[in-house]
Every structure is written in C-alpha cells, then in structure tokens.
C-alpha cells in the first residue's frame, strides 16, 4: 500500500488541483475496505463513496449529480458539497463537504465509467470474479437485503455491458491471505510497470 500511495502522490493533478483516483469493481469485491486502507496510507485522504451518490431510483444514472456536486467544484479548486443518500429513509440528506485534497478517492461500482475517466488520475480495479463478489456481498448484507440484490445484479450486468471499467484500469488489485497483490492493468503505464510487476514477489504485496 505504501508503494501505491507513493505512486499516486507523484502523479500530476487530474481534476483541478486534485489527483482523483477511482476504485471500481463488482459489488462485494472489497472496494470500500481497500479504499479505506489506501486513504489511511495517504494520511487521511478523503473518500467519496458512490453509495452516497446513487439512490434506489438511480442505481447507475447518477453521473449528472456527481459532476455538478463534486467534479465541477473540485475542478475550480473549491470544496465540493454533495447530498448523501440515506438508503433506509430513501431520501438525500444534508450536504456534506469534500475538500480539494491532493488525492481524493472515488469508490464504488461505476467509478471508472466513461464520463468520469477524463477526470481520473488513475483507475484501480478490484480483481474478483463477479459471481464470487456478488456471493460475498449477499452474505455480508444478509437475507434482509435479498430483494435489493435481486434487482442490483441485473442492473450491474447492464451497466458494465454498456460502460465497462476494467479495460481502462491502470492497476488490478487482488486480495490475498497476506494482503493485496497489485499488478499493472490493461491501461497501465510504464509507471505502474515500474512500481508493480508480477515478478516483484513481496514488493507487489501490501
């Protein structure tokens, strides 16, 4: 994780003064946990969770809201204010600030969608097969969320069929018993190859 944090810090800004980093993957693939650990390694970098931007009525049709509430202010170097969605109350809450920190993480399914990629400094993909990820997510959320998952899975299938993220990922992350394994992704550059190569052994784990 230290190597990834070092790589991100040295990147040029991508969204105003911010290095915006997307963490994408199938639901249940471990995005939130990974983003939280990466944020800590970055000294407390802000994390925008797309669960706060999406809603029951707009599982994936939230691009306009994200652009207006978050991306456009950050591009101006201003603090963004977004209204997080309350999934229990089924309504948006009071605005929450998101400062233009040197690195800001955007975590959630669809973080690497086409409309957002021009604003990203890097895109990370959690490398876990979708069926395995969905099984993990169902187990995590329990029987009470069965109906939600029954609707979510076909919606996620449609989203990635129309707007795939993985082919544009700079880095692939696999969670193992000893930590995270990191490999250059399909869109990886020489910088990823320098920091993360399959032959690096322990240096590719964190």
Which ranges hold each PLM region?
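NTP-dependent small-molecule kinase module
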Residues: 1-15, 118, 139, 161-206
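Active-site signature of alpha/beta-hydrolase-fold catalytic machinery across serine-
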Residues: 37
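ATP-dependent NMP and nucleoside kinases share a basic, alpha-helical "lid"
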Residues: 93-140
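Conserved nucleotide-sensing/catalytic segment adjacent to the nucleotide-binding pocket
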Residues: 46-106
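Hydrophobic positions on the alpha1 helix immediately C-terminal to the Walker A/P-loop
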Residues: 34
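Conserved lysine of the Walker
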Residues: 31
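P-loop (Walker A) phosphate-binding loop of NTP-binding proteins
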Residues: 26
């Amino acid at each position: 994780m230290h190597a990834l944090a070092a790589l991100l810090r040295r990147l040029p800004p991508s969204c105003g003064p911010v290095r915006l980093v997307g963490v994408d993957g199938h639901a249940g693939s471990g995005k939130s946990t990974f983003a939280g650990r990466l944020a800590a390694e970055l000294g407390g970098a802000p994390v925008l969770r797309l669960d706060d931007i999406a809603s029951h009525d707009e599982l994936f049709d939230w691009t306009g809201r994200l652009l207006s509430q978050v991306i456009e202010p950050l591009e101006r170097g201003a603090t963004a204010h977004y209204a997080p969605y309350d999934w229990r109350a089924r309504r948006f809450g009071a605005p929450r600030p998101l400062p233009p920190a040197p690195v800001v993480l955007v975590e959630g399914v669809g973080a690497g969608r086409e409309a957002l990629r021009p604003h990203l400094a890097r895109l990370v993909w959690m490398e876990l097969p979708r069926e395995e990820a969905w099984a993990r997510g169902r187990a995590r959320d329990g029987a009470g969320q069965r109906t939600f998952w029954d609707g979510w899975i076909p919606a996620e299938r449609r989203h990635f069929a129309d707007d795939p993220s993985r082919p544009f990922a700079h880095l692939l992350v696999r969670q193992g018993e000893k930590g995270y394994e990191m490999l250059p992704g399909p869109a990886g550059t020489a910088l990823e190859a320098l920091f993360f190569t399959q032959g690096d052994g322990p240096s590719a784990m964190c």
